[in-house]
C-alpha cells in the first residue's frame, strides 16, 4: 500500500489541526483488507499465533504512541477492516486464533489509553449487514473475552440493504452487548 505510519502522522496532524479527533484503522495487512481479503503482512507469514498476537500488540501500541507523541488527537482505533471472514491471515470468528488477534489489538489500545490517561475507543469493524450476521460476530467476540467499545459497520446502500436493516442490526448489538455502534464506511 501507499500509507504508512509517517503518512498517517501527517494526515492525523492535519485533521487534529482542523479540530477533529482521528479514527485510526489498522488493516494488519500489507494492502487493503476487506471481507474477501484478510492477508497477513508478508513479514508475519510464518509466525505462530503467539508471535502474531505479540506483534499485533506491539505494532498497535508503538504506532499509537508515535501518533500521540506527534500531537495527533486519536479518539478511536479500529482493529481490522471489514473483518467478517477473519483478520491478519486468520480465518473465521469462531477460530480462537482470529479472536486472539482482536483481543491483542484491543488490549494494546487499552494499554495506551491507560498509560496516556486518554480516552481512546477500541473499534471492531464488519461489513454486509444485509446478511444479518452481526449478532453472531458480537457473540463470538464476547465468548472469546474480546473487550471493545464500538461495533462498527460498513454501509453501502447498493450492496448492504436498507437503512432500517442496518439500524436493526446495530441496535441489537447495543441492546444485547451494551456496545456503541457506528457506520464507519459509507
Task: List where the protein language model places each region.
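Conserved, mostly hydrophobic/aromatic
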Residues: 25, 77, 151
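Active-site clefts of carbohydrate-active enzymes
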Residues: 85-91, 121-124, 128, 148, ...
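Active-site flanking residues adjacent to catalytic metal/cofactor-binding acidic residues
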Residues: 24, 81, 184-185
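Conserved residues at the C-terminal ends of beta-strands
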Residues: 1, 80, 154
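N-terminal carbohydrate-binding/catalytic regions of secreted carbohydrate-active enzymes
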Residues: 1-17, 21
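Anion (oxyanion) recognition and catalysis
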Residues: 16, 110, 174-175
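Short, solvent-exposed beta-strand-terminating loops
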Residues: 22-34
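Active-site cleft segment of glycoside hydrolase catalytic domains centered on the general acid/base Glu
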Residues: 5-6, 34-140, 146, 161-168
Amino acid at each position: 500500500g501507499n500509507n504508512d505510519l509517517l503518512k498517517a502522522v501527517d494526515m492525523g496532524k492535519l485533521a487534529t489541526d482542523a479540530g477533529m479527533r482521528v479514527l485510526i484503522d489498522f488493516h494488519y495487512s500489507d494492502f487493503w483488507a476487506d471481507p474477501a481479503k484478510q492477508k497477513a503482512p508478508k513479514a508475519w507469514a510464518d509466525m505462530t499465533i503467539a508471535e502474531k498476537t505479540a506483534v499485533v500488540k506491539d505494532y498497535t501500541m508503538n504506532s499509537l504512541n508515535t501518533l500521540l507523541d506527534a500531537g495527533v488527537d486519536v479518539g478511536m482505533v479500529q482493529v481490522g477492516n471489514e473483518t467478517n471472514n477473519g483478520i491478519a491471515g486468520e480465518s473465521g470468528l469462531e477460530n480462537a486464533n482470529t479472536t486472539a488477534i482482536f483481543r491483542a489489538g484491543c488490549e494494546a489500545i487499552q494499554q495506551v489509553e491507560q498509560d496516556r490517561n486518554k480516552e481512546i475507543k477500541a473499534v471492531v469493524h464488519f461489513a454486509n449487514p444485509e446478511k444479518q450476521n452481526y449478532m453472531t460476530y458480537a457473540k463470538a467476540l464476547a465468548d472469546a473475552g474480546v473487550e471493545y467499545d464500538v461495533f462498527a459497520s460498513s454501509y453501502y446502500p447498493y450492496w448492504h440493504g436498507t437503512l432500517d436493516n442496518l439500524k436493526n442490526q446495530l441496535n441489537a448489538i447495543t441492546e444485547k452487548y451494551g456496545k456503541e455502534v457506528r457506520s464507519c464506511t459509507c
